[in-house]
């Protein structure tokens, strides 16, 4: 699991079994932090790896495969892009101007906080639990068997296809459905 927090300084801490610590790699490429196991080594029989990262600003989150990300503190953002695919999961509290979410596969997201503009694109069997995410304006595209729950107070523009489901709380002005 990757735990992220917003702090004044940058830092990273890795907790794992002693036998895999030497094979855990961290690198920053093009401003992106990558955490992975050395691909040239086959490791069997280890328990979960936990990584804690602190940073002052976060702009992008990308969780794939069976990756798990949890916010250990609320984040204040101008614009945040979250991409979750495969069986990836994201649990985060955010406050800010704009949050864009793209979720596919069996991705699971649990978001809370306050956002002015929320752009949501979901497909396959992705799910969003966002009852505690208070959104002013929402633009949602949901397809496949994806399901989203969100609280909207201002304007809603939605395109739902296949067996997609959008459940919203509030009384938004619907401009497209």
Residue ranges and their predicted role:
Residues 1, 16, 23-28:
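Solvent-exposed adhesion/ligand-recognition segments of exported proteins
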Residues 1-13:
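Start-of-domain marker
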């Amino acid at each position: 699991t990757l735990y992220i927090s917003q702090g004044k300084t940058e830092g990273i801490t890795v907790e794992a079994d002693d036998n895999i610590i030497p094979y855990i790699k961290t690198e920053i490429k093009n401003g992106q932090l990558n955490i992975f196991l050395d691909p040239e080594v086959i490791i069997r029989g280890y328990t979960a790896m936990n990584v804690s990262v602190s940073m002052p600003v976060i702009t992008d989150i990308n969780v794939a495969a069976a990756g798990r990300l949890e916010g250990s503190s609320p984040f204040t953002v101008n614009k945040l892009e979250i991409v979750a695919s495969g069986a990836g999961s994201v649990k985060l509290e955010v406050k800010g101007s704009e949050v864009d979410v793209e979720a596919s596969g069996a991705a699971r997201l649990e978001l809370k906080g306050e956002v002015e503009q929320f752009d949501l694109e979901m497909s396959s069997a992705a799910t969003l639990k966002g009852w505690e995410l208070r959104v002013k304006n929402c633009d949602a595209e949901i397809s496949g068997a994806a399901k989203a729950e969100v609280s909207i107070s201002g304007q809603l523009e939605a395109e739902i296809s296949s067996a997609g489901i959008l459940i919203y709380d509030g009384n938004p002005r619907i401009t497209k459905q």
